[in-house]
Amino acid sequence: HEHRGFAGTLSLPPQLLLDLVLAVGTDLAAAGFQRLVLLNGHGGQIALLEVAARQLHAAQPALAVLPCFLWRGPEGISQRIPEPERQRGLHAGLAETSLMLHLAENLVGPGRQADGPDQEPPEGWSLEGQAPCAWLTRELSSSGVIGDPAGASAELGQALFEALVEGWRRRFQSLLNSDWPPGSRRC
């Protein structure tokens, strides 16, 4: 719900997502699936999908449930994004805008101004990461942009895209080559 109040935003109650993951996962387990990867690209759903994964696995112990966040995982992604954008660029900032310039440039508007406050969370805290603060988009931005998209480019977007695809491909291949979850028997 952190983006509520901005045009085009649809927000679903958190319980609905939990119930949906549990229902779909239960049916997949009944159909014989042994693994379910929840690949998420929205930072506001990281913790919720981790809870959903744990609940689903508790209800269906034979189903390995792996909640993944697009930007966490592939090595080298964060190094391609300069500071302070690495910490601040959470929504329509440099990285996301660059990706969109690479994938669908016609959907990116010409004016890319950052309008969020310069104030940082207290020392030791962050907007996301190891010690996240709860926040709402309207507290950080009047436009919905959190970060600075001004330096975005299709070239950076292509580099990020290729690194994300290759990084996740390697990670999924590793999963396929494994016997995960522990104690499972595979044919």
Predicted segments, located by residue:
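Extended, histidine- and acidic-residue-enriched regions that form the cofactor-binding/catalytic faces
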Residues: 1-37, 43-187
